[in-house]
From Swiss-Prot:
SUPFAM superfamilies: GHMP Kinase, C-terminal domain, Ribosomal protein S5 domain 2-like. NCBIfam families: ispE, PRK14608.1. Keywords: ATP-binding, Isoprene biosynthesis, Kinase, Nucleotide-binding, Transferase. ATP binds at residues 94-104. Pathway: Isoprenoid biosynthesis; isopentenyl diphosphate biosynthesis via DXP pathway; isopentenyl diphosphate from 1-deoxy-D-xylulose 5-phosphate: step 3/6. The keyword DNA damage does not apply. GO terms for molecular function: 4-(cytidine 5'-diphospho)-2-C-methyl-D-erythritol kinase activity; ATP binding. The active site is at 10, 136. Catalyzes the phosphorylation of the position 2 hydroxy group of 4-diphosphocytidyl-2C-methyl-D-erythritol. One of its GO terms (biological process) is terpenoid biosynthetic process. This is 4-diphosphocytidyl-2-C-methyl-D-erythritol kinase. Belongs to the GHMP kinase family. IspE subfamily. It comes from Bacillus cereus (strain ATCC 14579 / DSM 31 / CCUG 7414 / JCM 2152 / NBRC 15305 / NCIMB 9373 / NCTC 2599 / NRRL B-3711).
Length: 289
């Protein structure tokens, strides 16, 4: 039996770090929303008791480093599943980009295998399992738009922001999330107003959203990788309504309301950056139907 599952990327409209926890993680407060840039996974049930990862993308690991592999392994161990699965990952989301591509693949694997193996788990139970794999996996199980707290695994759903274009630009560099958090000095950064962002999203205020975007990690990544700051400057210069780095980077996104301006920004960035995408805010929550 085969099953096809979609794994959408996310962006952070607001990201704040409140402090370091005793378990080594950081306490965060952030707003994430899904976009219609997505990986596609094909799950094929195997009679043999093994997990196989296949992908044409050479940057996708085919072993336990892969979060989709970890998701399948977790379900097999928790629920004593003796069957195996082959997971083919068609990557569209850039790897190590601050867009939760790996986490979304893991979330899609949890949702898909819940059906394929008839486990009968609720979406809340899947999200709880997702937290054992990675901080963003719980959100990716649900999708939509949400406030994430704790280390990112506590999810509270809010309204979907008004529909708009999202221009993404990723420079040809990798950013270590651990290094970014390691260099973060909480008393020397500007903290975004996450609560205000919740208010303007819930009231459908597009201009308010554009005025309130913020990411406490931006200046840290900019200091480590000045080319990320240059992309942000270019996107602003081309006329995006709001520009922000997603996650710990290096991807920068711009919000754009008008089609003509979207095309102008997209074409301008194509001459400046190798990986550029024009997508829409998705905002739809996943279901198990």
């Amino acid at each position: 039996m085969k099953l096809l599952v979609k794994a959408p990327a996310k962006i952070n409209l607001s990201l704040d770090v409140l402090g370091k926890r005793q378990d080594g993680y950081h306490e965060v407060k952030m707003i994430m929303t899904t976009i219609d840039l997505a990986d596609r996974l094909e799950l094929t049930e195997l009679a043999e008791d093994r997990i196989e990862i296949l992908s044409h993308n050479r940057y996708v690991p085919d072993d336990q480093r892969n979060l989709a592999y970890q998701a399948a392994k977790l379900l097999k161990e928790k629920f004593n599943v003796k069957k195996g699965v082959s997971i083919t990952i068609e990557k569209t989301i850039p790897v190590a980009a601050g867009l939760a591509g790996g986490s979304s693949d893991a979330a899609a694997t949890l949702r898909g295998l819940n059906k394929l193996w008839n486990l009968g788990l609720t979406i809340d139970e899947l999200a709880e399992l997702g937290a054992e794999i990675g901080s963003d996996v719980s959100f990716c199980v649900y999708g939509g738009t949400a406030i994430a707290t704790g280390r990112g695994e506590k999810i509270e759903h809010i309204k979907t922001p008004p529909s708009c274009w999202v221009i993404l630009a990723k420079p040809h560099i990798g950013v270590s999330t651990a290094d970014v958090y390691g260099n973060l000095k909480l008393n020397r950064v500007t903290h975004p107003n996450v609560d205000k962002m919740v208010d303007v999203i819930n009231s459908g205020d597009y201009k308010g959203i554009c005025d309130t975007v913020g990411n406490v990690l931006e200046d840290v990544t900019f200091g480590m990788h000045p080319e990320v700051a240059r992309i942000k400057s270019q996107m602003k210069r081309f006329g995006a309504d709001a520009v922000l780095m997603s996650g710990s980077g290096p991807t920068v996104f711009g919000l754009v309301h008008h089609d003509s301006r979207m095309h102008r920004i997209y074409n301008g960035l194509k001459g400046f950056c190798e990986q550029v995408y024009a997508v829409r805010l998705l905002g739809e929550r996943e279901t198990l139907e």
